[in-house]
């Protein structure tokens, strides 16, 4: 989706957003009373539009990849397989 086709409510610096480490999302208050949300994985893959789940408003998140928290490596449990 091209940004020109979207109706963007505002542009917000990522430093002004709140990061929820448990849910791995950034959020920012929406005028409707809910909040804009965007997943950190979406940001890592180049997505920069946060949406409000309660209304039609969207914001553009201004950030550099270096602004994002380091990606946590998920440890996998070793599984032994006997043939």
From Swiss-Prot:
Keywords, sorted A to Z: Cytoplasm, Iron, Metal-binding, Nucleus, Oxidoreductase
Names of required cofactors: Fe(2+)
Gene Ontology biological process terms in this record: protein histidyl modification to diphthamide; tRNA wobble base 5-methoxycarbonylmethyl-2-thiouridinylation
GO molecular function, one term: ferrous iron binding
Entry keyword annotation includes Metal-binding: yes
Annotated Fe cation binding sites: 30, 32, 52, 55
Gene Ontology CC: cytoplasm; nucleus
InterPro entries: DPH3/4-like, DPH_MB_dom, DPH_MB_sf
Reactions catalysed, as given in the entry: [3Fe-4S](1+)-[protein] + Fe(2+)-[Dph3] = [3Fe-4S](0)-[protein] + Fe(3+)-[Dph3]; 2 [3Fe-4S](0)-[protein] + 2 Fe(2+)-[Dph3] + NADH = 2 [4Fe-4S](1+)-[protein] + 2 [Dph3] + NAD(+) + H(+)
Record-given protein name: Diphthamide biosynthesis protein 3
Organism expressing this protein natively: Emericella nidulans (strain FGSC A4 / ATCC 38163 / CBS 112.46 / NRRL 194 / M139)
Gene designation: dph3
């Amino acid at each position: 989706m091209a940004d020109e086709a979207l109706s963007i409510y505002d542009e917000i610096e990522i430093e002004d957003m709140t990061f929820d480490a448990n849910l791995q999302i950034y959020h920012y208050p929406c005028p409707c009373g809910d909040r804009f949300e965007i997943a950190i994985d979406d940001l890592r893959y180049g997505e920069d539009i946060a949406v409000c789940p309660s209304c039609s408003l969207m914001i553009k998140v201004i950030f550099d990849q270096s602004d994002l928290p380091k990606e946590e490596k998920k440890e996998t449990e070793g599984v032994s397989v006997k043939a």
